[in-house]
Swiss-Prot record:
Any single GO CC term annotated in Swiss-Prot or TrEMBL for this entry: cytosol
Needed cofactors: K(+)
Recorded family membership: Belongs to the TRAFAC class TrmE-Era-EngA-EngB-Septin-like GTPase superfamily. TrmE GTPase family.
Entries under HAMAP family matching the protein: GTPase_MnmE (MF_00379)
Xref: Pfam families: MMR_HSR1, MnmE_helical, TrmE_N
Keywords of this entry: Cytoplasm, GTP-binding, Hydrolase, Magnesium, Metal-binding, Nucleotide-binding, Potassium, tRNA processing
Keyword hit for Metal-binding: yes
Organism annotation: Synechococcus sp. (strain WH7803)
Name of protein: tRNA modification GTPase MnmE
Subunit structure: Homodimer. Heterotetramer of two MnmE and two MnmG subunits.
Function: Exhibits a very high intrinsic GTPase hydrolysis rate. Involved in the addition of a carboxymethylaminomethyl (cmnm) group at the wobble position (U34) of certain tRNAs, forming tRNA-cmnm(5)s(2)U34.
Gene assigned in the entry: mnmE
Compartments, record wording: Cytoplasm
Principal location: cytoplasm
Enzyme Commission code: 3.6.-.-
């Protein structure tokens, strides 16, 4: 990693979620040279308790000169280098909620040399001090943000160093090939001939491994970030019934009256480990009702923001010109499925579109028939169908860099096909090695690190 200026200040932040009436315990974390002194200044530790590293102390946080007890706390001291950041770290475990936590944090921030931590700054210091590699730090952030068990499992694989080990192994293979090439450039007459075909084959194998990691990362992105699926259709085709069926609760009001849903309803569910936000839109039709028109406008917005659109139509009526008009309004860039609802009362000639082809999915939102097929189709269409063999998942930054490395190796292959000298091979090979080094943090600058860690939560 390139040399980066280190901030000598001590930082402090709440490391746990803070919400009114939620959480019995909160943790305030400090890291830096003044961490121990700052906490000693604001606490009273009774008896003969010793401020030794990796010991838990009991006491109280006091309010300034008055000596008023703000809270009863436990203090955990972790001296450098045996801490998360590699610096002196002190954690104050106080009662949760909002007021007590704010008062304790304010007392800490009043101490000389202590400032409020920036988002992700604790993790950034851990990386700078060699306590974490960058991929593990990013995986910790993903673990905190995980919205499903499968996403948490993938994040934990990164925390355990899986991504770092895989990328480092691929990078080492490229470094081996680069050393062979450079040796031939400098000392070709003194060395045996290089097997260019074997070298090219090795580069292709590494490129294939990188492309697989990129593909797996796309599936992992759906597991981490979730998908937005919009339910769209004419009034009274069963959108709200399907929302309630998939949500396993009465999220939307269901009646036989068209136009019942007048606003955009959202419901969070998990399908096969993938977090899904279902968007139940207002039925799109011509109407003079001002409130309903607002809901219809939001339905159009939902079409553009969705990862997938489920266009519902009524199998008991068949495909209508209004259904076709709705299909034409779906943006070309947004995938969609035609879902025929009310299969239990379908007319014999119901069809999915003007072409006469069958609906992608036929189901009954009231009985649940066809639900499993719908779930499978949703995940397949969004590229989010993952089997148990998915062990590692690159995030967006890592995936982009892996793709850059794969593209550089493809250019190297073209150089070889053009019959250019060895030194031309090394240009793109060096770029691939550099891109992989950026994934693990070996090739990074301060500005890039700042951008990465600014996306982390405060206190992490």
């Amino acid at each position: 990693m390139q040399e980066i200026n280190r901030d000598a200040q001590t930082i402090a932040a709440v490391a746990t979620a803070v919400a009114p009436g939620q959480g019995g315990i909160a943790v305030i974390r400090l890291s830096g040279p003044q961490a121990q002194a700052a906490v000693q200044s604001v606490t009273r530790i009774p008896g003969q308790q010793s401020w030794e590293s990796h010991r838990v102390l009991y006491g109280h946080v006091l309010a300034g000169e008055s000596g008023e007890r703000i809270d009863e706390v436990l203090v955990l001291l972790m001296l450098a280098p045996r801490s998360f950041t590699g610096e002196d770290v002190v954690e104050i475990h106080c009662h949760g909620g909002v007021i007590a936590v704010q008062r304790v944090l304010a007392r800490v921030l009043d101490q000389p040399g202590v400032r409020r931590a920036l988002p992700g700054e604790f993790s950034q210091r851990a990386v700078l001090n060699g306590r974490l590699d960058l991929t593990r730090a990013e995986a910790i952030s993903d673990l905190v943000a995980a919205r499903s068990q499968r996403a948490a499992e993938l994040a934990m694989a990164g925390v355990d160093g899986g991504i770092q080990k895989r990328i480092t192994a691929l990078r080492d293979r490229l470094l081996d090939q680069l050393s062979e090439l450079e040796a031939r450039v400098d000392f070709e007459e003194d060395l045996p001939a290089l097997d260019g075909a074997a070298l090219l084959e090795e580069l292709q194998r590494v490129r294939g491994a990188l492309q697989q990691l990129v593909k797996d990362g796309q599936v992992g992105a759906a597991l981490r970030q979730g998908l937005r699926v919009a339910l769209v259709g004419r009034p009274n085709v069963g959108k709200s019934s399907l929302l309630n069926r998939l949500s396993r609760r009465e999220r939307a009001i269901v009646t036989d009256l068209p136009g019942t849903t007048r606003d955009l309803l959202e419901s969070e569910i998990v399908l096969e480990g993938v977090p899904i936000t279902l968007l139940d839109t207002a039925g799109i039709r011509a109407t003079s009702d001002a409130v309903e028109r607002l809901g219809i406008a939001r339905s159009h917005d939902a079409l553009a923001s969705a990862d997938l659109v489920l266009l519902l139509f009524d199998l008991s009526v068949g495909w209508t010109p209004d259904d076709e008009a709705l299909r034409q309004r779906i943006p070309a860039a947004v995938p969609h499925l035609l879902v025929g609802n009310k299969v239990d009362v379908a007319v014999s000639d119901a069809r999915a579109g003007t072409s006469g082809s069958a609906a992608d999915i036929r189901l009954s939102a009231s009985t649940g028939a066809g639900e499993a097929e719908l779930v499978q189709a949703v995940l397949e269409r969004c590229g989010a169908l993952a089997d148990g063999s998915l062990l590692l998942s690159l995030n967006q930054r890592q995936g982009d860099l892996a793709q850059q490395a794969a593209d550089a190796l493809a250019r190297s292959a073209q150089v070889a096909a053009d019959g250019l000298p060895w030194d031309f091979w090394t240009i793109d090979l060096r770029q691939a090695i550099h891109s992989l080094g950026e994934i693990t943090g070996e090739e990074l600058t301060e500005s890039v690190l700042d951008r990465i860690f600014s996306r982390f939560c405060i206190g992490k």
